[in-house]
């Protein structure tokens, strides 16, 4: 060991001495004695390794408490951190999809803080059913005879098939064999449910006769799958649910539909593209309809199945139902969200998903102009900052080809170097509340459609 190395080692403080410092007393109170001691040992080891490798002390050796505090704060951050979503995708799967209404947040908080009547019947003072209250709401909204709730729509499809068609064939149009994120494929789900897939038609055209010709003594279901995350256009033909129900009645075969995203209101009244609604399919005679809770419905992650009472009873009694059931927090949030649909006049204000989807481009443009001056003053030396029109998307596989006119704050490096955009985006991701945008066409875009808290946004970006 050289004299210089020995001298550097001698400058490393004893852990006991550091722990007596007032700053470390505060850290010990906040994070616990054991964790602080473990971290200091780790930091001393790191310093020793650096001395051996570089004959130098780490820069943070001038202020051990500050470095320890920074590390402990970062370590204590939740894995599920709040972010400001300015990607232009309203229902962003990677960012948690639908924001919950205040009523849903309050309901979840109450369910977490107190025992609740999850499976308790107050009238009979005995065991109740966890789906009952929500089933009544869903029947009221959709016109269905009964309903069943599980933890997501993939689970809903799995349960629907396993409980009604295991060991038998399910007839589906080839153009509806969808794959969603995470390689969830309808044919794979059918195999897991114990069903045999019977494809009919072609990718772009399926006729009523294709379904009729496919039915045999082993057919359990005729199935429709709404292609909510892609669109087939041009020379196309499909059989709608009403016609398929007519075929099913003729052949005594139930019809089921997986709607995917699923909307409980006619979106066209808000100037949005119309999506098929569960209540329309129930009215057409479909036996079971499944859809998501956390997409266009605007609630928590859940799989919802509505339909005929005898079919729902088969789902409720299947062993998979217990494995896939929703917990009390999900049910509390979903009930509160569904109750908002009983007051449709206030829905576009109270339901965050609908509120964000229906924001007008003109208002978003005004918001951008309001935010422009402080951002230009802060970033103007390196970037040209402007407000530009852009196109938002709904996301989560909903209405994939439709776009929503919006406005964005854009940042373009004066020197044209794309690396500056990557650096800026990375810096924003490291903020206490990360700001997430998107880079394309030589600019960093912050689509303002989902920005409601301007104060927090400016507080982050002007740091």
From Swiss-Prot:
Residues found modified as N6-(pyridoxal phosphate)lysine: 295
Recorded GO CC terms: cytoplasm
Native source organism of the sequence: Escherichia fergusonii (strain ATCC 35469 / DSM 13698 / CCUG 18766 / IAM 14443 / JCM 21226 / LMG 7866 / NBRC 102419 / NCTC 12128 / CDC 0568-73)
Protein name listed in UniProt: L-seryl-tRNA(Sec) selenium transferase
Alphabetized InterPro entries for the sequence: PyrdxlP-dep_Trfase, PyrdxlP-dep_Trfase_major, SelA-like, SelA_trans, SelA_trans_N_dom
The protein's role, per its UniProt record: Converts seryl-tRNA(Sec) to selenocysteinyl-tRNA(Sec) required for selenoprotein biosynthesis.
Primary location recorded for the protein, binned into one broad class: cytoplasm
A Gene Ontology BP annotation from the UniProt entry: selenocysteine incorporation
Cofactor(s) for this UniProt protein: pyridoxal 5'-phosphate
Location in the cell: Cytoplasm
Family note: Belongs to the SelA family.
GO terms assigned for molecular function: L-seryl-tRNA(Sec) selenium transferase activity
Database matches in Gene3D superfamilies: 3.90.1150.180, Type I PLP-dependent aspartate aminotransferase-like (Major domain)
Signal peptide: none
Pathway assigned in UniProt: Aminoacyl-tRNA biosynthesis; selenocysteinyl-tRNA(Sec) biosynthesis; selenocysteinyl-tRNA(Sec) from L-seryl-tRNA(Sec) (bacterial route): step 1/1
EC number: 2.9.1.1
Self-association state and partner proteins as the record states: Homodecamer; pentamer of dimers. Binds only one seryl-tRNA(Sec) per dimer.
Catalytic activity: L-seryl-tRNA(Sec) + selenophosphate + H(+) = L-selenocysteinyl-tRNA(Sec) + phosphate
